[in-house]
């Protein structure tokens, strides 16, 4: 039975093998290469490698011949293309006169049909990539990227014609030359393509740069060709001015390391080149460091971890020296001071404001950079195998910096030393000596790194098993607190509280008595005097730190032929020792904390009492809550701020927390304004110690206001009662006073005029009283009791005194209707008209009256 085969298309034929099986040959007639086979998989005759040197001119001739043969084969392929007449005509129309998108689509079809025959189409696509239109250029670049990843590039690096190992062989055919010529063309073409990407990666438009970063990452991930140049481009984008681009580049590098773990060492070396380049900015270093410290390491990648440690230490040393130079350069000169003092010069004020903003931004970046270095050291050390010699070299450099640099720099260096030492599970005595010495540094008072310093102090002491050394630190912490500001004192007390909780043996410093030298017993030793004994009476062996060997002192004297030596052990505390573990703090009492029990700052006093009596301290320390600025901010009453937006999830971003979260100046932690009745109505036990001053102040003001209003009301009522009694007595003596107002011959117009004059006089006197009351209220807040009583008495004498809580709308910005005020206004007008009638009647009274009518009043 005959086998049926599909009808071949024009230009195709059926090829039968020896077994009689037929296959359709997709290769058009007259074409040397099958378009269905990738160009790098085309079967070629095997050649033996020939290492014979080939002349450069001969290589150029071979390449020219290969390109010429390839061009002729491409023309034959286009003539016998397996498209219908209509399809071929449509493609030619789109390429010649279509839109850019249509041209790109048509050229893509030609390249996909047979890449080795589409040299002209590839060159046309590359020309579109260089257009000024960003949309067209990015579209063509994305199309070429898809072609390269989709099969145009092999999974190996391309070679130029001169790099072919079999070029000098005698059996080289035209097929070899055509394939090698196309590969050489493609390598040059790909390099030009990367150059266009590099130019567009510095474009002013953000979306163009973002697309270029994505293209570079995709090419790096998929193909090895030009990976060194592509990696350099990707890492250079860490220094982009746009933070979004730098962040995207950092993320792309980490994704590349996850896809190709073997490239971590290559990537790290390239990052090392970038971070130590002179043109790399501080912000670029930050993005570079967070890329390095987020590199995932394993115990098999020791070389990568060692390189990271080397980068961190070298960069940290260079950074500290750069910061020192910047501090010297930013020191204000006389000319700068004169400009700053000129308050009328608006330009200098604006320049100073811009300079302050710049310095603030630089300090923020510097702190982030140092934090990134410390994080990287902490993560890389467990996987590194740094030899002792190199580690000691790094440590010696860092310790030298602590003694010469500024205090802020010294704190950061100590943090790095602690991180590195803790990673090796060994913290030297040299580190604790430096930390112990830093407590006496006078620059600690004005340092902006107090929070970092306290954290370092806590982390260093909480893991120290040397109890006498920890006791010495606690003694010195209390001693230096005597001249420090309350924010730092509260922080030190919090550190001590945590140490006492963690180590119960430290509690004896608050309960046991002080041990002195005279508390120990002296021991006398008698021995015969040797002839070769030294005649010196006193001799003491001391080490370089000034401490006596075995903590003992000796004295000797000779009685006859008998030498008597007394040996006395030093037990008292000596705070002058350089090494804290030899200061004898284990037998000392913490008597220095006694003055803090009555400290002027309520929080310091509370913390001191809690330490002495062993009470628990609630909450976390926040140094900013105890500053003078924070205290004064509480007098700025304003509406609570809106809740802050949720923070990101970056590992480099700290989480929000603590009692200061959402805290608004002028309010308690619950958000209740201090000048409201809701705050003053609380019990005193519910008020934090740092809010007691405000609680007492507003409570006293509220009570005095109530008393003043009550006294005013009582006097008004007494006056009205006396006036009613007088009126009743007059009516009893003169019944004709009950006549109607119409019968009275009293001129109401004259009375109104007289009352108006009286009202103006009373208003003038009231204004004078107001001025006097305002002047009395402008006295200092902290006054003695006599002044306060005088102020209260003066408030009672004036009718128009303004009370603190008379109208809550004066303090709280709420829009409510004042119905009570309207009612009071109506009552006041009615009272005024009633008094007016009484005054009219009193004017008609006779000058003389019977004494009997007033007898009962005179008796009282």
UniProtKB/Swiss-Prot annotation:
Gene Ontology BP annotations: ribosome biogenesis
InterPro entries registered for this protein in UniProt: ARM-type_fold (IPR016024), CCAAT-binding_factor (IPR005612), CEBPZ/Mak21-like (IPR040155), EF_Hand_1_Ca_BS (IPR018247)
Start-end of Acidic residues biased regions: 716-725, 738-750, 813-824
Biased composition (Basic and acidic residues): 334-345, 536-551
UniProt entry keywords in alphabetical sequence: Phosphoprotein
Pfam families named among the record's database cross-references: CBF (PF03914)
SUPFAM superfamilies for this protein: ARM repeat (SSF48371)
Region entry Disordered, spans: 334-360, 530-551, 708-798, 813-842
Family assignment from sequence similarity: Belongs to the CBF/MAK21 family.
Annotated protein name in UniProt: Uncharacterized protein C4F10.09c
């Amino acid at each position: 039975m005959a086998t049926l085969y599909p009808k071949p298309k024009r230009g195709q034929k059926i090829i039968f093998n020896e077994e009689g099986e037929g296959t359709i040959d997709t290769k058009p007639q007259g074409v040397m290469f099958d378009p269905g086979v990738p160009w790098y998989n085309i079967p070629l005759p095997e050649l033996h490698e020939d290492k014979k040197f080939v002349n450069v001119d001969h290589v150029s001739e071979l390449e020219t011949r290969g390109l010429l043969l390839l061009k002729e084969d491409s023309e034959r392929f286009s003539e016998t293309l397996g498209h219908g007449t209509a399809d071929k005509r449509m493609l030619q129309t789109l390429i010649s006169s279509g839109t850019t998108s249509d041209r790109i689509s048509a050229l893509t079809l030609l390249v996909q049909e047979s890449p080795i025959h589409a040299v002209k189409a590839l060159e046309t696509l590359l020309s579109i990539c260089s257009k000024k239109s960003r949309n067209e250029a990015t579209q063509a670049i994305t199309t070429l990227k898809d072609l390269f990843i989709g099969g145009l590039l092999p999974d190996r690096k391309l070679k130029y014609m001169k790099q072919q190992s079999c070029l000098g062989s005698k059996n080289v055919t035209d097929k070899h030359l055509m394939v090698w010529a196309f590969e050489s063309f493609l390598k040059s073409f790909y390099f030009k393509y990367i150059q266009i990407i590099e130019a567009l990666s510095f474009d002013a438009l953000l979306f163009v740069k973002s697309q270029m970063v994505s293209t570079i990452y995709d090419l790096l991930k998929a193909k090895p060709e030009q990976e060194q140049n592509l990696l350099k481009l990707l890492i250079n984008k860490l220094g982009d001015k746009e933070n979004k681009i730098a962040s995207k580049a950092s993320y792309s590098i980490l994704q590349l390391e996850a896809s190709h773990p073997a490239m971590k060492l290559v990537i790290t070396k390239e990052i090392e080149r970038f971070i130590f380049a002179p043109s790399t900015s501080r912000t670029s270093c930050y993005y570079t460091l967070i890329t390095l410290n987020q590199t995932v390491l394993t115990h098999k990648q020791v070389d990568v971890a060692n390189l990271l440690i080397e980068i961190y230490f070298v960069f940290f040393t260079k950074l500290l020296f750069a910061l020192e130079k910047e501090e010297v350069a930013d020191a204000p000169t006389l000319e700068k001071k004169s400009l700053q003092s000129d308050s009328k010069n608006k330009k200098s004020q604006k320049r100073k404001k811009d300079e302050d903003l710049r310095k603030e931004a630089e300090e923020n970046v510097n702190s982030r950079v140092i934090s990134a270095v410390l994080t990287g050291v902490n993560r890389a050390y467990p996987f590194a195998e740094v030899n002792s010699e190199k580690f000691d070299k790094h440590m010696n450099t860092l310790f030298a910096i602590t003694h010469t640099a500024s205090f802020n720099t010294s704190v950061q260096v100590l943090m790095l030393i602690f991180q590195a030492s803790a990673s090796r599970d060994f913290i030297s005595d040299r580190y604790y000596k430096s930390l112990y010495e830093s407590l006496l540094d006078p620059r600690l008072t004005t340092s902006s790194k107090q929070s970092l310093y306290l954290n370092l102090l806590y982390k260093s002491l909480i893991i120290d098993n040397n109890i006498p050394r920890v006791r010495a630190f606690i003694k010195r912490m209390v001693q230096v607190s005597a001249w420090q500001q309350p924010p730092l004192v509260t922080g030190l007390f919090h550190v001590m509280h945590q140490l006492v909780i963690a180590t119960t043996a430290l509690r004896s410093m608050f309960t046991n008595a002080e041990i002195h030298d005279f508390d120990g017993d002296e021991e006398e030793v008698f021995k015969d005097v040797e002839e070769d004994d030294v005649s010196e009476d006193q001799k003491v062996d001391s080490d370089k730190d000034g401490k006596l060997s075995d903590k003992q002192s000796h004295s000797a004297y000779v009685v006859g032929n008998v030498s008597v030596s007394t040996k006395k052990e030093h037990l008292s505390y000596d705070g002058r020792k350089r090494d804290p573990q030899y200061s004898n703090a284990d037998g000392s009492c913490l008597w220095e904390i006694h003055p803090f029990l009555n400290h002027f700052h309520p929080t310091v006093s509370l913390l001191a009492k809690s330490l002495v009596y062993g009470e628990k301290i609630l909450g976390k320390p926040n140094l900013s809550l105890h500053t003078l600025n924070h205290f004064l901010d509480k007098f700025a009453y304003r509406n609570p701020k809106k809740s802050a937006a949720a923070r990101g999830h970056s590992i480099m971003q700290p989480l929000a927390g603590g009692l200061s979260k959402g805290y608004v100046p002028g309010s308690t932690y619950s958000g209740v304004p201090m000048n409201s009745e809701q705050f003053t109505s609380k019990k005193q036990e519910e008020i934090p110690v740092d809010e007691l001053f405000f609680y007492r102040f507003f409570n006293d003001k509220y009570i005095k206001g109530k008393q003043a209003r009550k006294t005013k009301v009582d006097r008004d009522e007494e006056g009205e009662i006396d006036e009613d009694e007088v009126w009743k007595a007059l009516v009893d003596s003169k019944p004709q006073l009950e006549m109607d107002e119409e019968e009275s011959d009293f001129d109401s117009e004259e009375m109104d005029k007289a009352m108006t004059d009286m009202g103006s006089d009373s208003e003038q006197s009231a204004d004078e009283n107001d001025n006097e009351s305002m002047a009395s209220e402008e006295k200092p807040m902290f006054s003695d009791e006599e002044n306060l009583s005088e102020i209260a008495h003066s408030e009672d004498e004036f009718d128009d005194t303004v009370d603190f809580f008379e109208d809550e709308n004066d303090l709280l910005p709420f829009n409510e209707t004042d119905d009570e005020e309207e009612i009071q206004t109506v009552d006041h007008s009615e009272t005024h008209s009633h008094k007016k009638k009484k005054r009219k009647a009193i004017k008609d009274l006779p000058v003389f009256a019977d004494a009997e009518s007033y007898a009962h009043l005179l008796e009282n």
